[in-house]
């Protein structure tokens, strides 16, 4: 019975920590550039695009495809950075918990 109470207490503490971590992640931002800094993308912690900067030299009709590729590359890099930061925070929160390999938390 004591073990069950201890597990319930741990679960409640984990829930509070997860909420705090989710709030912290929501305020995070990740930025990445491509094309030597010609395009910069910033994503919020929720994964939404919050800023896009494009060097005016790319605003030429014959360079549309290059611009599109640079935006996609910068976005993908920013997303990878954001996911890495989220994974790091999640790992620090769940350290020491008996979570099965491959189990994904719901956030």
UniProtKB/Swiss-Prot annotation:
Keyword presence, Translocase: no
Keywords of the record: Cytoplasm, DNA-binding
PANTHER family for the chain: NUCLEOID-ASSOCIATED PROTEIN YBAB
Principal subcellular localization: cytoplasm
Molecular function GO labels: DNA binding
Organism: Brucella canis (strain ATCC 23365 / NCTC 10854 / RM-666)
Protein name as annotated: Nucleoid-associated protein BCAN_A0034
GO cellular component, one term: bacterial nucleoid
Subcellular location: Cytoplasm, Nucleoid
Described purpose of this protein according to its UniProt entry: Binds to DNA and alters its conformation. May be involved in regulation of gene expression, nucleoid organization and DNA protection.
Tree of life domain: Bacteria
InterPro entries listed in its UniProt record: YbaB-like_sf, YbaB/EbfC
Record SUPFAM superfamilies: YbaB-like (SSF82607)
Transmembrane feature ranges: none
Subunit structure: Homodimer.
Family of the protein in this entry: Belongs to the YbaB/EbfC family.
